[in-house]
C-alpha cells in the first residue's frame, strides 16, 4: 500500500523550515578557529624551531639491509632510483659529500 504523496511532502517541507546550523555551526566554528588553527600554528612553530642540521648516524653494515642480488637497471646499478647521497647509504657505507 503506497503512502499518500501529500503527507510525505508536508513532512519534508516542515523539516526544511527549521533553523540551519544553530549551535552546531557555533561549535564547529569554535573547533576550527579556537582549536585547529592554533594547533597547526603551534606544530608549525615547533617544527621550525627544531629544524636544523643534524649529524647523520654512523653507518652500521647490517647484513640484512641493502641487499643487492642483481644490479639496478639504471645508472651504475648500485644506486636506488631516488637515491640521495646525503641521506641514503650504499651497501658499503655513505658516499663522501
UniProtKB/Swiss-Prot annotation:
PROSITE patterns xrefs: COX6A
Residue ranges the record marks as coiled coil: none
Residue ranges, Mitochondrial intermembrane side: 50-97
Mitochondrial matrix side: 13-24
Domain of life: Eukaryota
Annotated InterPro entries: Cyt_c_oxidase_su6a (IPR001349), Cyt_c_oxidase_su6a_CS (IPR018507), Cyt_c_oxidase_su6a_sf (IPR036418)
Pathway as given in its UniProt record: Energy metabolism; oxidative phosphorylation
Transit peptide: 1-12
A Gene Ontology cellular-component term: respiratory chain complex IV
Membrane topology classification: Single-pass membrane protein
Tissue-specific expression: Heart/muscle specific isoform.
Biological process, per Gene Ontology: mitochondrial electron transport, cytochrome c to oxygen
Principal place of residence: mitochondrion
Function: Component of the cytochrome c oxidase, the last enzyme in the mitochondrial electron transport chain which drives oxidative phosphorylation. The respiratory chain contains 3 multisubunit complexes succinate dehydrogenase (complex II, CII), ubiquinol-cytochrome c oxidoreductase (cytochrome b-c1 complex, complex III, CIII) and cytochrome c oxidase (complex IV, CIV), that cooperate to transfer electrons derived from NADH and succinate to molecular oxygen, creating an electrochemical gradient over the inner membrane that drives transmembrane transport and the ATP synthase.
UniProt protein name: Cytochrome c oxidase subunit 6A2, mitochondrial
Species in which this protein is naturally found: Bos taurus
Lineage: Eukaryota, Metazoa, Chordata, Craniata, Vertebrata
